[in-house]
Amino acid sequence: MVYQLVPFQKRAFQNGSFQNCVVSLLSGGALFSFLLSIFFVLFLLTPVRAGELPKFFTYLKAVDPSILQEMRYYGSHNFLGRRVKGYKAAECILTMPAARALKKVQKRLRPKGLSLKVYDCYRPQRAVNDFIAWAKKPTDIKTKAEFYPTLKKSKLFGLGYIARRSTHSRGSTVDLTIVPLPPKTQPEHNPSKQTACFEEVDSRYKDNSLDFGTGYDCFHEKSHTKSRVVLDARKNRDLLV
């Protein structure tokens, strides 16, 4: 599902698991987008001291430390099976408006005993390039059993599960889910015991989020917005949107 802050609009979900809820900043229309693109080029070319962020960017924990973080691409539990290039820390970095928007959602969820959990936020272009390079290696299928068991790697871009240009690289997009509080301890991921991400909740990897019908980054039709999922998963999807 795609959320655009200004104006608000919903579109059909096209890439990855339904848990990938995308927040994009479109204030000011095309001119703003053009200027923001220029800013990101300068951001990538300008040296920044360790721990220092460019203006208009923030660590999510500085805006709302109660939002849980599980930065999948910094670790190995992702469809590459290793840390993705460009990720230097397990930190969610966003534009300030996007971070504040998440804080507002979190404020509504907490009284219900729920919390947001983010999986990915700002995504360096190096990471996108890493995805592209990975897709060109047909023999590297060590994560296929969990993340894309019914598809060939060569189909992932054409079907929209992975994008060659990611809105994450603008810092205004976030992959997230909803977790019951207090959060349960997740089992350590064992790559030698993979189960398909579209299996029933008791069979696939036991993420501590609500059941949305699939695991995170599930490249399968069951992750599509209008796919048929069990009633509880459908209710959770409705809550997320």
Located regions from the model:
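Residue-identity detector for glycine
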Residues: 16, 28-29, 51
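Bacterial N-terminal signal peptides
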Residues: 28-44
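Extracytoplasmic cell-surface/polysaccharide-interacting catalytic and binding patches
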Residues: 47-121, 128-241
